[in-house]
Amino acid sequence: MQNQNDFDVVVVGAGSAALNAALSAREQGSKVLVLEKAPEHLRGGNSYFTGGLFRFAYSGLEEIVDLLPGIGPEEQSKIDVGSYDNSDFYADVMRVTEGLSNPDILQILVSESYPTMIWMRDQGVPWILAYGRQAFEHEGKLRFWGGLIVESVGGGKGLSDRLFELCQNAGIEVRYLSAATELKTDNKGKISGVIIKGPDGYES
């Protein structure tokens, strides 16, 4: 009989990145546990308090329309999204980190950013154009700037609530008031588990 604490993947934290990682692991067939040290009513980490804007590389309007198929021809004619390619994204991250980002990892982040947006949409995360904060009117069109075109419906709260709903629907267990305190390793140094401090004390 399988122990109730036997999981293939343990995700520590319950922000946007964590919950997407949990969904991805579950999609691959893994039994997944998410640990959230906050109580349920304060769940979601920093993601809950963000505006829900997402930065990703894209080549132009066609890719934005592919991501947001609800944008009809009339709306398309009234907007200018420009482009924000891989080199733009890469350069911006290197600029704000003063060149300290790992180049190889950053290249993966940049090149996978648009496919990840498509994947999140297909999982059930709804996106909309960020008219309110990232567009200004110029020569009869609403022009987007700064490489930020899209936001999640409902901002950070909407994103967080939706991701928790998707995790629940996928059969992913979330434990609240539960913090990872230590990694367990086998005699070869391979990670084999995690020590959890929960409401009833420590467990593994």
PLM feature spans:
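Gly/Ala-rich phosphate-binding loop of Rossmann-like dinucleotide-binding domains
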Residues: 22, 26
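Short, solvent-exposed loop/turn and secondary-structure capping segments
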Residues: 43-47, 60, 132
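Glycine-rich FAD pyrophosphate-binding loop
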Residues: 27-50
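Core beta-strand elements of the Rossmann-like FAD/NAD(P) dinucleotide-binding domain
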Residues: 3-7, 199-204
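Beta1/beta-strand and adjacent pyrophosphate-binding region of the FAD-binding site
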Residues: 3-17, 33
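N-terminal glycine-rich dinucleotide-binding loop that anchors FAD/FMN and/or NAD(P) in oxidoreductases
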Residues: 48-87
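Second-shell loop/turn segments in exported
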Residues: 75-80, 92-108, 149
